[in-house]
């Protein structure tokens, strides 16, 4: 597949895909017109994310390396953003990490305030994070996890071809604005 690479000054905010898919008007107000109103729900969401977003914090638990607030980008999709958490699981296959022994597989984890939804804006955001990581780390990431604060549980999300194509299509649409 041939594609053009975006310049950094044309990058969109990765998190915008969630707003765009949920409500294009909301996305335009936040990301184009820079209008944002805090409310109880957004403040609760910010508090939940503060636990995940401790920039540069790395934590090792046995064969698990946890990186918080990891910056990611994709020149192919023209986006940049931050993963709440990326877990690197040590195993028999995967990628090598600088300064670490062995091979690791990456699993992005996105924190959400509420509970699982019927539609897929959260899934698209998580898939976009995985696709950025794949481009940056030259690997394949088959799944990630959404952690929902309201139910205090993770939901595993598989990244199939349909989800990946939808992410690419939506970012291409967003770039036209």
Language model features with spans:
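Metal-dependent nuclease catalytic cores that hydrolyze phosphodiester bonds in DNA/RNA
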Residues: 1-108
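Nucleic-acid nuclease catalytic cores
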Residues: 81, 87-177
């Amino acid at each position: 597949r041939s594609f053009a690479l975006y310049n950094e000054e044309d990058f969109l905010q990765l998190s915008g895909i969630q707003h765009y898919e949920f409500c294009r008007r909301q996305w335009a107000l936040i990301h184009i017109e820079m209008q944002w109103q805090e409310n109880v729900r957004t403040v609760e969401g910010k508090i939940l994310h503060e636990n995940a977003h401790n920039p540069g914090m790395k934590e090792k638990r046995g064969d698990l390396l946890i990186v918080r607030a990891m910056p990611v980008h994709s020149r192919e999709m023209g986006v940049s953003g931050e993963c709440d958490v990326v877990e690197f699981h040590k195993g028999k296959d995967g990628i090598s990490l600088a300064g670490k022994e062995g091979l690791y597989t990456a699993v992005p984890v996105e924190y959400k305030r509420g509970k699982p939804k019927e539609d897929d804006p959260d899934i698209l955001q998580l898939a976009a994070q995985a696709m950025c990581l794949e481009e940056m780390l030259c690997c394949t990431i088959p799944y990630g996890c959404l952690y929902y604060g309201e139910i205090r549980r993770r939901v595993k999300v598989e990244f199939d071809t349909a989800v990946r194509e939808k992410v690419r299509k939506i970012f291409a649409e967003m770039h036209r604005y």
